[in-house]
């Protein structure tokens, strides 16, 4: 099944292949599979939410680069696709929560709603870390993200 991001990806690869130059030295660093898929999911959300043409071009450029890395390095399976959908859903929730927190900030409303939203950030980040860890475990990532916070 082809989704809108696969089609957009294929169309944009051709557009940006000739435009992708790096005026500064490229920084290449190993990252975990979970981190890569997390970043790609965030870029897909940005492509959907951010409408500025200039911003879209920058997001598309990064998206294409990271999708190429995914295509070259990650063997997809139904489980990985499911985990990608889950991490994207968590990141969409975080996007909405962060926007609502900013609205509270704008109104200087730091009451019950602000506290609930603030707590939702770390609950969602904990889910996100768990999904990334599962992706890393399944794919045998060399690098694994370690998180340790006080229990709640």
Mark where each language-model region is:
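Secretory-pathway ectodomains
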Residues: 1-7, 12-14
